[in-house]
Amino acid sequence: MRHNARADRPNNIAWERASGAEPAGDPRSGMEKIMTTNEKALALHEQWHGKLETVSKTPVRTREDLSLAYTPGVAEPCKVIAQDKEAAYTYTWKSNTVAVVSDGSAVLGLGNIGPYAAMPVMEGKAVLFKEFGGVNAVPICLDTQDTEEIIKAVTYLAPGFGGINLEDISAPRCFEIEERLKKILDIPVFHDDQHGTAIVVLAGIINALKVVGKKKEDCRVVVNGAGSAGVAITKLLLTYGFPNVIMCDKVGIVSRSTEGLNWMQQKMAEVTNLGNETGTLADALRGADIFVGVSAPNIVTPEMVSSMNKDAILFAMANPVPEIMPDVAKAAGAKVVGTGRSDFPNQVNNVVAFPGIFKGALEGRAAQITEEMKLAAANAIANLVPEDALNEDNIMPEAFDPKVAEVVAEAVKSHIR
């Protein structure tokens, strides 16, 4: 898969406006035209007609080419694979290809927009797999939100892929779908909204702690948002060794006495908030050292930040509007602030994780992506920022650094058993 980069530039006003050219025949010629990012994206998606295309690795220009790529020669690898299905890794694209699977039920901040509307996101994800990790990826949007049907569909599709990246499937269904597929399939199954997010958050926190001079054992951590990302972040922080993690959601602090929790939130209530505190997000943040938000815009106030411990770390990752704007958080006393956005310092973005994770898992023929691999990936990402370059505005590696995917892949491979 690659970008659909045509040599013949389409002659249409939408494309010319998006690319900065003066549209021929535009009635507004001579007038200033300023397009927003959203307008540019829409115009370019119209021009692209999809961000991917199929490209052949082998030329088919002669009769011999045809006989080798297709009949009769293609029968030979088929016969070998029929005797040993593992040979598919040698004779097909299975060894370096993943499926990006979504039901469109929880897409970005757009919610349940369905499989058709989810396709641009899945195409974009596939582009990032290829561009940043060299991994082929195929977007698959399923027209069902039934858990059993999704599990069956992915199981039936699995022979053609070396891994499954689940994407934008709503909680709590996403937890069951991933866990059951991991038990059924012998290839890696990875819900990036959960684990990719958790890995980059942990990487950022590792470096932020170095900047503020605190130890994980001494930190009170508040994770706001008890959906797929919040649950996975909390699990990985606990695995890493943070002893004091409190989850919050719309109901406030999640405790063992909180009513209306789904089954996964109930499980998390058993291993977090060991003091069984109750109250609001403001109550949880009082005396906290670290805040991780994967929730809603503008729900953290300056007063809440001021109530946190000195040199607080805030990752406000709601998109496109974070829980609190970085300048406001800094003015209220926060030391290190990260967001999910590229226009602020410390972008905490999954793109530094998932391409390398799958690259390593595929190259090492891992059957699963384990907790050890996730921790190794987080440490590898953190270590990509040199100690002498670490500061409150530089805790994450640059996504365009070509070393990122390679380093993460090696970290993953080193923990394949």
PLM feature spans:
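Short, low-complexity intrinsically disordered segments enriched in A/P/G/S/L with frequent Arg
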Residues: 9, 19, 24-28
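General beta-strand structural signal in soluble alpha/beta enzymes
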Residues: 139, 165-168, 189-192, 223, ...
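Glycine-rich phosphate/diphosphate-binding loop of Rossmann-like nucleotide-binding domains
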Residues: 108, 113-130, 195, 199-292
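Rossmann-like adenosine-cofactor binding region
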Residues: 266-336, 341-343
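Adenosine-phosphate binding glycine-rich loop
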Residues: 192, 316-417
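N-terminal ligand-binding/catalytic initiation module
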Residues: 20, 32-187, 409, 415
